[in-house]
């Protein structure tokens, strides 16, 4: 849920901001036939359906299925040798979001709550409620998402703090240790849906807690420490607040951008991210942050720097290789996304 909540919410927000950018070539199952729904929403609904499954009651939330016992080298998906105690290629464990340290062996997480998961899951559900209500005239699914958003947000308020990923025998995990940004995002989206002032006040309070906390001023960080690497909540809240608060929110974004601008001035490609594990995620995040900053303020002073980060990902790098499969067609790009299938 750490990653799926973010991926789902980001796809939904991208569609909401620019629906004209997304086409309809396949159906929900990926068959090459249009189904009247933009493909990005077909993909996002896989995330929503998964999130509904693991949040199957008002106070219920699972956050992880399986662990590093899956890390057994190259294997076919239908002949999985992973064994969780029920034999190979069988059942897997599911971890409930308790908000407390978890881990079945020596490498325990440092969890303190569940608000990171609950907050951004609430954001995803709130956006989905708007889209399925207004775009697809599906009040049943829209209400299901709205109810989930309200429930998840309340769960986050009751257990402020962060739930981390769990490992079994490996010393690494998803070390996310921030949560106020996620609750800000959830509160801002719910205010947009309900107009209830309590959500607006919550969002402003969480925004000031989240402030400028980010990877942007760090040269190193634990794996996934500042996930999801950008605070979308500042952007969503911006349109609902007074001039003074707008300046605060824009200032938070600007501070992070300035840190990366300084770092980028020290290399030929003007890349502003530290080259650590998941540095491409950071490049996407700071590019997105500058796009949202421009939308908020109209200030384009960082535009060329933003293009440099984007172009690095698209092939203007020492390898002349795109970091995306099948795009852009003019440069080399990865063609074997599933290493096991290619190897076997």
What are these regions (language model features)?
Residues 29-40:
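Acidic, glycine-anchored loop motifs typical of Ca2+
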Residues 165-176, 217-224, 268-277, 326:
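Acidic, Ser/Thr-rich low-complexity linear motifs
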């Amino acid at each position: 849920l750490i990653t799926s909540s973010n991926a789902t919410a980001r796809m939904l927000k991208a569609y909401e901001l620019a629906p004209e950018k997304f086409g309809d070539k396949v159906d929900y199952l990926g068959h090459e036939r249009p189904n009247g729904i933009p493909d990005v929403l077909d993909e996002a609904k896989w995330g929503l359906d998964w999130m509904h499954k693991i949040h199957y009651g008002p106070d219920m939330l699972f956050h992880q299925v399986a662990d590093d016992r899956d890390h057994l080298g190259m294997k076919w998906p239908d002949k999985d040798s992973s064994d969780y105690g029920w034999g190979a290629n069988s059942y897997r464990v599911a971890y409930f979001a308790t908000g407390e340290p978890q881990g079945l062996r020596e490498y325990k997480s440092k969890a303190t709550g569940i608000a990171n998961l609950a907050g951004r899951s609430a954001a995803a559900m709130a956006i989905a409620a708007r889209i399925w209500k207004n775009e697809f005239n599906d009040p049943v699914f829209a209400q299901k998402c709205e109810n989930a958003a309200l429930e998840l947000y309340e769960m986050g308020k009751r257990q402020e703090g962060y739930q981390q990923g769990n490992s079994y025998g490996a010393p690494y995990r998803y070390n996310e240790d921030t949560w106020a940004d996620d609750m800000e995002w959830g509160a801002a989206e719910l205010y947009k849906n309900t107009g209830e002032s309590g959500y607006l006040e919550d969002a402003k309070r969480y925004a000031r807690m989240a402030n400028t906390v980010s990877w942007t001023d760090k040269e190193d960080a634990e794996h996934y420490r500042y996930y999801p690497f950008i605070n979308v909540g500042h952007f969503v809240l911006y349109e609902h607040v007074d001039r003074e608060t707008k300046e605060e929110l824009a200032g938070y974004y600007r501070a992070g951008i300035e840190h990366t601008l300084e770092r980028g001035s020290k290399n030929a490609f003007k890349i502003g991210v530290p080259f650590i594990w998941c540095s491409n995620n950071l490049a996407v995040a700071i590019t997105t942050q500058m796009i949202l900053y421009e939308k908020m303020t109209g200030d384009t002073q960082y535009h060329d720097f933003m293009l440099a980060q984007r172009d690095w990902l698209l092939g203007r790098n020492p390898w002349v290789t795109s970091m995306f499969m099948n795009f852009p067609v003019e440069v080399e790009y990865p063609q074997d996304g599933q290493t096991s299938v290619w190897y076997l």
